[in-house]
């Protein structure tokens, strides 16, 4: 049955095409170089392929999460060495945001490890968002499941994007997470859209899912209506103490295929290389950029796991003739 997962929106953003799992799986089966080439053409039609959006991600409340996500070192259920830390104060967060901006970041993302915020937390978050927004940065928050009215409060404070990942396909989901359902995630995404916030929504590759399940994950994202403005693609970072610490290694070409398929199915979305980039070679990252990735997390840490060093990122971008995205270079001139 051809259905999209309708999310509320205050702006028209018609779904262009329905993507069945079989149709997405057929893309995965495309010969590797042909798939990358096709994705590169789609990318050029919608973005400047030499411009990379730089985002910084900061954990503003760390550890102690009651959820059982099998990949997450911040879960209180696993012995991973992550120490619980309460919500940071506004001044410390703003200082980090200033540093991020001085180093070229245009978006500042904030993550809090809890199932979802309480009303008192929202009051603190709105203060933080206003302070970061005043620096001239785009703001993004990943704060878990939202109750009614919370998304509107975040929007009013100046939040631009809300991140809430699907993580994986509906078929594979219960093998990874048991304390919140796939539909719970869709429900929060609906509240985010209804409030007029932009959506950042992606997932994690390499959690023992099959290629068909990867296709199901991409299909679920591509059939959100409207599609997410930002799609983070994470490669599993295996952390000792988590249930997925011994997950099977994923061949690098499969990750690049996933990036390419995301670009083809969601042509106007930012496709972000997120967690796991520290373990990627320069050559693999270059292939991801060729396949349509146009955003990275920039900084030496992603929440509680390592990230590629900034000096290495700057050098790689120089080698590939890439430049940080600005409002002036976001699109090729013929696409303006």
UniProtKB/Swiss-Prot annotation:
Radical SAM core domain location: 50-277
InterPro entries noted in UniProt: Aldolase_TIM, BATS_dom, Biotin_synth/BioAB, Biotin_synthase, Elp3/MiaA/NifB-like_rSAM, rSAM
Catalytic activity reported: (4R,5S)-dethiobiotin + (sulfur carrier)-SH + 2 reduced [2Fe-2S]-[ferredoxin] + 2 S-adenosyl-L-methionine = (sulfur carrier)-H + biotin + 2 5'-deoxyadenosine + 2 L-methionine + 2 oxidized [2Fe-2S]-[ferredoxin]
Gene3D superfamilies the record matches: Aldolase class I
SMART domains (alphabetical): BATS, Elp3
This protein's pathway: Cofactor biosynthesis; biotin biosynthesis; biotin from 7,8-diaminononanoate: step 2/2
Known function: Catalyzes the conversion of dethiobiotin (DTB) to biotin by the insertion of a sulfur atom into dethiobiotin via a radical-based mechanism.
Protein name: Biotin synthase
Organism the protein comes from: Mannheimia succiniciproducens (strain KCTC 0769BP / MBEL55E)
């Amino acid at each position: 049955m051809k259905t999209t997962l309708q999310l509320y929106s205050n702006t028209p953003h018609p779904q262009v095409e329905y993507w069945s799992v079989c149709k997405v799986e057929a893309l995965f089966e495309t010969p590797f170089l042909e798939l990358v080439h096709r994705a590169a053409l789609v990318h050029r039609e919608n973005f400047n392929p030499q411009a990379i959006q730089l985002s910084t991600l900061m954990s503003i409340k760390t550890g102690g999460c009651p959820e059982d996500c099998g990949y997450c070192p911040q879960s209180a259920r696993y012995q991973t060495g992550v120490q619980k830390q309460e919500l940071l104060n506004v001044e410390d967060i703003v200082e980090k945001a200033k540093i991020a901006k001085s180093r070229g970041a245009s978006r500042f993302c904030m993550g809090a490890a809890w199932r979802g915020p309480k009303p008192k937390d929202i009051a603190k978050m709105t203060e933080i968002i206003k302070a970061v927004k005043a620096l001239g940065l785009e703001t993004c928050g990943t704060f878990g499941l939202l109750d009614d009215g919370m998304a509107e409060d975040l929007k009013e404070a100046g939040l631009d994007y809300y991140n809430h990942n699907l993580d994986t396909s509906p078929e594979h989901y219960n093998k990874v997470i048991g304390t919140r359902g796939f539909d719970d995630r869709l429900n929060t995404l609906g509240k985010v859209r209804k409030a007029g916030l932009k959506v950042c929504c992606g997932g994690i590759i390499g959690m023992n899912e099959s290629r068909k399940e990867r296709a199901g994950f991409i299909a679920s994202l591509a059939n959100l209506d409207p599609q997410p403005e930002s799609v983070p693609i994470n490669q599993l970072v295996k952390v000792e103490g988590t249930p997925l610490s011994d997950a099977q290694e994923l061949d690098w070409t499969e990750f690049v295929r996933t990036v390419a398929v995301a670009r083809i199915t969601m042509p106007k979305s930012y496709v972000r290389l997120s967690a796991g980039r520290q373990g990627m070679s320069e050559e693999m990252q270059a292939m991801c950029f060729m396949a349509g990735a146009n955003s990275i997390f920039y900084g030496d840490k992603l929440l509680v796991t390592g990230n590629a060093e900034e000096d290495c990122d700057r050098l790689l971008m120089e080698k590939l003739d890439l430049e940080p995205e600005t409002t002036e270079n976001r699109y090729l001139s013929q696409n303006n």
